Curated annotation (Swiss-Prot):
<dbReference type="GO" id="GO:0005634">
    <property type="term" value="C:nucleus"/>
</dbReference>
<dbReference type="GO" id="GO:0006357">
    <property type="term" value="P:regulation of transcription by RNA polymerase II"/>
</dbReference>
<dbReference type="InterPro" id="IPR036236">
    <property type="entry name" value="Znf_C2H2_sf"/>
</dbReference>
<feature type="zinc finger region" description="C2H2-type 4">
    <location>
        <begin position="213"/>
        <end position="235"/>
    </location>
</feature>
<dbReference type="GO" id="GO:0000981">
    <property type="term" value="F:DNA-binding transcription factor activity, RNA polymerase II-specific"/>
</dbReference>
<keyword id="KW-0805">Transcription regulation</keyword>
<protein>
    <recommendedName>
        <fullName>Putative transcription factor Ovo-like 1</fullName>
    </recommendedName>
</protein>
<dbReference type="GO" id="GO:0043616">
    <property type="term" value="P:keratinocyte proliferation"/>
</dbReference>
<keyword id="KW-0862">Zinc</keyword>
<dbReference type="Pfam" id="PF13465">
    <property type="entry name" value="zf-H2C2_2"/>
</dbReference>
<dbReference type="GO" id="GO:0001822">
    <property type="term" value="P:kidney development"/>
</dbReference>
<dbReference type="GO" id="GO:0008270">
    <property type="term" value="F:zinc ion binding"/>
</dbReference>
<dbReference type="GO" id="GO:0044771">
    <property type="term" value="P:meiotic cell cycle phase transition"/>
</dbReference>
<dbReference type="GO" id="GO:1901994">
    <property type="term" value="P:negative regulation of meiotic cell cycle phase transition"/>
</dbReference>
<dbReference type="GO" id="GO:0007498">
    <property type="term" value="P:mesoderm development"/>
</dbReference>
<dbReference type="GO" id="GO:0051729">
    <property type="term" value="P:germline cell cycle switching, mitotic to meiotic cell cycle"/>
</dbReference>
<dbReference type="GO" id="GO:0043588">
    <property type="term" value="P:skin development"/>
</dbReference>
Length: 267
C-alpha cells in the first residue's frame, strides 16, 4: 500500500474505523474526519495535558475515568459518517484534537452538484455521483452474470469482462504517442503520460472524451462506429461482434430518422 494512503495521525481513542481506498487512478483524495466505530482496544499511552471534556460516548467512558485529561468531542458515539455541511466544523485544527482520527479517503474527481457524497453501505467507499455508486454496487453481487470464455472467471459488469479478456487476447488499443508503450485502458495511458512524460490532460471532468471503437479480434481502432462496422465486415465477417454492432448501428440509425421526421413535419 502506498505510504500516502496510511493514517497520518495515531489514534488516541480506544477504537477507530478505517475507510477503504478506491483503486481507480482517476480519483482524487480528501481528508475526512472519522468518528468512532468499533475496533480492538489500543495499548494505553500517557496523553499530553489538555482541558478535559466529559465524553458522552459509552465506549470512551472507561478511558475518561482512567485518565482525566482525555478529551473527546461531545455527542453520541456513532459509526463513521460522510462529510457534509454540518460536519464542516470538524475539519478545522481545533477539532482535530478532540478524539477524531483523520484518515485518507479517496473519492472521485469533480464536484457533485449538491456537494454531498454517495456512500456504499457495504464497504463505505464514497462517490460524487449516484451513477458511479450504482455501478460500484455490482461488485458486491454474488452472482457473476458475465463469464470469460477463456478462463471462466465471472464479472458483474461487461466493461470489467472486456478489460479482463484483453489480458488473454493481448489487445492494447491505447498507444502512447511519445513511446512504444500500449495499454488496455485509457486511464492507464493517461497515468503513463502524466508520470513518465509529464503530460497533463486538459479536458474537464464532465467533458466527454472522443470514444475509440476497438476491435476485440485484432485490436484495430476506429474513430467512428461506421468505420468499426466496415472493419468487422471486411476482416471478421464471421465474428459475433459484427451482429451485435450491426444491431446497435441499426437502432442508432432508426432513432436518427425518427428524430428528423418529428422535427420536420413536412418530410
Amino acid at each position: 500500500m502506498p505510504r500516502a494512503f496510511l493514517v497520518k495521525k495515531p489514534c488516541v481513542s480506544t477504537c477507530k474505523r478505517n475507510w477503504s481506498e478506491l483503486p481507480d487512478e482517476e480519483r482524487g483524495e480528501i481528508y475526512v474526519p472519522v468518528s468512532l466505530g468499533f475496533c480492538p482496544p489500543q495499548p494505553y499511552r500517557e496523553p499530553e495535558p489538555s482541558v478535559a471534556e466529559p465524553p458522552s460516548c459509552p465506549l470512551a467512558l472507561n478511558m475518561s475515568l482512567r485518565d482525566s485529561s482525555y478529551s473527546m468531542a461531545p455527542g453520541p458515539c456513532v459509526v463513521a459518517q460522510l462529510p457534509s455541511e454540518d460536519m464542516g466544523h470538524l475539519t478545522d485544527p481545533q477539532s482535530r484534537d478532540h478524539g477524531f482520527l483523520r484518515t485518507k479517503m479517496k473519492v472521485t474527481l469533480g464536484d457533485s452538484p449538491s456537494g454531498d457524497l454517495f456512500t456504499c453501505r457495504v464497504c463505505q467507499k464514497a462517490f460524487t455521483y449516484q451513477r458511479m455508486l450504482n455501478r460500484h454496487m455490482k461488485c458486491h453481487n454474488d452472482v457473476k452474470r458475465h463469464l470469460c470464455t477463456y478462463c471462466g472467471k465471472g464479472f458483474n459488469d461487461t466493461f470489467d469482462l472486456k478489460r479482463h479478456v484483453r489480458t488473454h487476447t493481448g489487445v492494447r488499443p491505447y498507444k502512447c504517442s511519445l513511446c512504444d508503450k500500449a495499454f488496455t485502458q485509457r486511464c492507464s495511458l493517461e497515468s503513463h503520460l502524466k508520470k513518465i512524460h509529464g503530460v497533463q490532460q486538459k479536458y474537464a471532468y464532465k467533458e466527454r472524451r472522443a470514444k475509440l471503437y476497438v476491435c476485440e479480434e485484432c485490436g484495430c481502432t476506429s474513430e467512428s462506429q461506421e468505420g468499426h462496422v466496415l472493419h468487422l465486415k471486411e476482416h471478421h465477417p464471421d465474428s459475433p461482434l459484427l451482429r451485435k454492432t450491426s444491431k446497435k448501428v441499426a437502432v442508432a440509425l432508426q432513432n436518427t430518422v425518427t428524430s428528423l421526421l418529428q422535427g420536420s413535419p413536412h418530410l
